[in-house]
């Protein structure tokens, strides 16, 4: 397990982009990921048995996508996370780490690390997120983790990362998820972007459809951004990371300030009560970043970024198409009642014009 100094560095690690995450506790910078051997978590099997990235693609392309079984987090409590519980496991879970061959590291977030794993019995390849129980206790994450799991288990959509199962042992909680072979949209954007209208419109349509599905279930994502969109085969993208997602009963409003600075909506900054329209605004920011290469309101300081967001200070390069400008301008509207609906996004001329070329 990482010591406190290492953990502190990970939480505050800065990437090239000045974009920071707002969660009431400080900043969390974008972190670069690099594949490497799993540290701190071992399945007891030779990692050489995991397919190479090329073979991994073939396995994922052909494998049947079906759940491996679910073990409830209801057994998890602050008491069960205490140091005394680390002596011997007494949990009755359907899955354990021994059921998997652990391969390359896919990424590392503020809390937890994600690995490519292969289910020994079925050969099923997934992404496994391992979160230290000590960190869950230290940062009071149990309630948020349970909410994230409950929300993700209740969703079934082709553009939302599937949570197959979850289990825990003496030291860690594990989330077994769908593996998207081509990684973050953010990395693709920085390496290959900005994107042309055909590709950008394809991505925006899929995310709009995922958000439309979530909103019908009264779920707000609250952290839509390129880092939380994963790319699979054939440019199919999937919305991921539901750590800030919340169930929002009809007619109710939220007040919590959370998300990423460049993607915050005016109503969240003010601050005042907000609803699922914060996701619609974020979709507009995402559309802009995909076709321009940078967020529309990005500045060197949080204060300047906030000012531009509140003024909706939107500027387009001359290279951006008329239809793309129109869609983005109709999403990035200060008045929440005047923003284009997600249905309107999916039937917008920019989408319909490019759809035949997807």
Swiss-Prot record:
Residues 100-358 form the Protein kinase domain. CDD domains: STKc_Aurora. It catalyses: L-seryl-[protein] + ATP = O-phospho-L-seryl-[protein] + ADP + H(+); L-threonyl-[protein] + ATP = O-phospho-L-threonyl-[protein] + ADP + H(+). Disulfide bonds: none annotated. Pfam families: Pkinase. GO terms for biological process: attachment of spindle microtubules to kinetochore; homologous chromosome segregation; meiotic sister chromatid segregation; meiotic spindle checkpoint signaling; mitotic DNA integrity checkpoint signaling; mitotic spindle disassembly; negative regulation of protein import into nucleus during spindle assembly checkpoint; regulation of cytokinesis. It is found in: Nucleus; Cytoplasm, Cytoskeleton, Spindle; Chromosome, Centromere, Kinetochore. It is an enzyme of class 2 (transferase). Residues 20-35 have a biased composition (Polar residues). One of its GO terms (cellular component) is spindle midzone. Keywords: ATP-binding, Cell cycle, Centromere, Chromosome, Chromosome partition, Cytoplasm, Cytoskeleton, Kinase, Kinetochore, Nucleotide-binding, Nucleus, Serine/threonine-protein kinase, Transferase. Its EC number is 2.7.11.1. Residues 1-49 are annotated as: Disordered. ATP binds at residues 106-114, 129. GO terms for molecular function: ATP binding; protein serine kinase activity; protein serine/threonine kinase activity. The active site is at residue 223. Component of the chromosomal passenger complex (CPC), a complex that acts as a key regulator of chromosome segregation and cytokinesis. Has a role in error-correction of aberrent kinetochore-microtubule attachments to ensure that sister kinetochores become bioriented and connect to opposite poles by promoting spindle assembly checkpoint signaling. Belongs to the protein kinase superfamily. Ser/Thr protein kinase family. Aurora subfamily. PANTHER family: SERINE/THREONINE-PROTEIN KINASE IAL-RELATED (PTHR24350). This is Aurora kinase.
């Amino acid at each position: 397990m990482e010591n406190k100094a290492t953990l502190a560095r990970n939480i505050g690690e800065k990437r090239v982009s000045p974009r920071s995450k707002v969660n009431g506790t400080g900043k969390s910078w974008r972190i670069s990921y690099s594949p490497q051997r799993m540290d701190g978590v071992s399945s007891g099997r030779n990692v050489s048995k995991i397919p190479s990235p090329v073979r991994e693609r073939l396995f994922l392309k052909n494998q049947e996508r079906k759940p491996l079984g679910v073990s409830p987090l209801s057994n998890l409590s602050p008491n069960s996370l205490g140091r005394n519980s680390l002596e011997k496991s007494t949990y009755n879970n359907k899955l354990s780490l021994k059921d998997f061959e652990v391969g390359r590291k896919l990424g590392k977030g503020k809390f937890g690390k994600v690995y490519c794993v292969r289910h020994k019995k079925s050969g099923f390849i997934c992404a496994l997120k391992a979160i230290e129980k000590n960190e869950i206790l230290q940062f009071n994450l149990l309630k948020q983790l349970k909410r994230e799991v409950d929300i993700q288990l209740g969703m079934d959509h082709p553009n939302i990362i599937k949570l197959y199962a979850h289990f825990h042992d003496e030291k860690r909680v594990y989330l077994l998820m769908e593996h998207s072979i081509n990684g973050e949209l953010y990395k693709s954007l920085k390496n290959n972007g900005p994107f042309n209208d055909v590709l950008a419109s394809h991505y925006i349509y899929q995310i709009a459809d995922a958000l439309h599905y979530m909103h019908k279930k009264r779920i707000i994502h609250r952290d839509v951004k390129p880092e939380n969109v994963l790319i699979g085969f054939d440019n199919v993208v999937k919305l991921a990371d539901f750590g800030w997602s919340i169930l929002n009963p009809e007619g109710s409003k939220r007040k919590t300030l959370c998300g990423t600075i460049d993607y915050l909506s005016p109503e969240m900054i003010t601050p005042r009560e907000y609803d699922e329209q914060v996701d619609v605004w974020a979709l507009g920011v995402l559309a802009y970043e995909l076709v321009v290469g940078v967020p529309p309101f990005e500045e060197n300081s949080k204060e300047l970024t906030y000012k531009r967001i509140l003024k909706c200070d939107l500027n387009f390069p001359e290279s951006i198409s008329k239809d793309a400008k129109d869609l983005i301008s109709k999403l990035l509207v200060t008045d929440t009642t005047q923003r284009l609906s997600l249905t309107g996004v999916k039937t917008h001329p920019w989408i319909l014009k490019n759809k035949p070329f997807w």
